[in-house]
């Protein structure tokens, strides 16, 4: 028996749809299981799906996600409220295709040797200093690439390349490409200090290591979660071994989503 969970944005419209979806799926004989679902239906927007991703990040190999957007077009959500009955029937009766997207692994290590902190990001990780300019060495594949001075760094996944990364002038990458992207935030470039000044696309197995020059407190944002880290030795970023799995019941082309989100359908 398939087990499901429904995650809601928490507003009246989303909560009403959540209740309706739960009732319909239970009527079809599916089991509601908030702890170990086979499929998670996210009702809201992209933020709701990010929340669901982090809630179930420990079982990404066993759980698939599908999104229903109740506001503006959701980049991860391909169903609208008027299609709820159709979606429920598809979940209950139709074998679905699994589409996997890469995610970002972030490991924070500390100078005192205490246990490292590991995170997964669906969209991006941003790294800033709360004490002014961020000054860090950036290593790629174990070799020093540059010393960065500026407001911060953004490391994004392909599916997250349309978010903060795009605002920084980064490229939009198709999620079939297993890579991460490193983009700079307001880097300092003059005759003394130089950075590459362009976004970098790092393929799978290319690790980016960010090592602070001075003793600062880092503000590390993992998607919507903002965390402070002190006494940091390094922050390691790479394509994670895990993937997020989406349940697809119909085509949902990536470039069509990009077009709808940023260009529109035109006249």
Swiss-Prot record:
It is found in: Cytoplasm. The active site is at 46 (proton acceptor). GO terms for biological process: NAD metabolic process; NADP biosynthetic process. It comes from Bacillus licheniformis (strain ATCC 14580 / DSM 13 / JCM 2505 / CCUG 7422 / NBRC 12200 / NCIMB 9375 / NCTC 10341 / NRRL NRS-1264 / Gibson 46). Keywords: ATP-binding, Cytoplasm, Kinase, NAD, NADP, Nucleotide-binding, Transferase. Its EC number is 2.7.1.23. The lineage of its organism: Bacteria, Bacillati, Bacillota, Bacilli, Bacillales. This is NAD kinase 1. It comes from the Bacteria. It catalyses: NAD(+) + ATP = ADP + NADP(+) + H(+). InterPro entries: ATP-NAD_kinase_N (IPR017438), ATP-NAD_kinase_PpnK-typ_C (IPR017437), NAD/diacylglycerol_kinase_sf (IPR016064), NADK (IPR002504). It is an enzyme of class 2 (transferase).
């Amino acid at each position: 028996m398939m087990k499901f969970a429904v995650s809601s944005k928490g507003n009246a419209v989303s909560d009403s749809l959540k209740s309706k979806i739960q009732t319909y799926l239970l009527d079809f004989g599916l089991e509601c299981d908030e702890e170990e679902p086979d499929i998670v239906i996210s009702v809201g927007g992209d933020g709701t799906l990010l929340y669901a991703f982090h809630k179930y990040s420990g079982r990404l190999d066993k759980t698939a996600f599908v999104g229903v957007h109740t506001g503006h077009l959701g980049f991860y959500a391909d169903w609208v409220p008027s299609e709820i009955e159709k979606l429920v029937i598809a979940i209950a009766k139709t074998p679905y295709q699994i589409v996997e997207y890469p995610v970002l692994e972030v490991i924070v290590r500390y100078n005192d040797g205490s246990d490292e902190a590991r995170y997964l990001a669906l969209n991006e990780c941003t790294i800033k200093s709360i004490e002014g300019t961020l000054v860090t060495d950036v290593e790629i594949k174990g070799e020093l690439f540059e010393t960065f001075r500026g407001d911060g760094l953004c490391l994004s996944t392909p599916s997250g390349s349309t978010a903060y990364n795009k605002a920084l002038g980064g490229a939009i990458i198709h999620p079939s490409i297993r890579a991460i992207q490193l983009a700079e935030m307001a880097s300092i470039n003059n005759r003394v200090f130089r950075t590459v000044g362009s976004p970098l696309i790092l393929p799978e197995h290319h690790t980016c290591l960010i090592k602070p020059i001075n003793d600062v407190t880092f503000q590390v944002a993992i998607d919507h979660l903002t965390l402070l880290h002190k006494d940091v030795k390094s922050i390691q970023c790479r394509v994670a071994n895990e993937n997020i799995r989406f349940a697809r019941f119909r085509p949902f082309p990536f470039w069509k989503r990009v077009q709808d989100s940023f260009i529109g359908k035109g006249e």
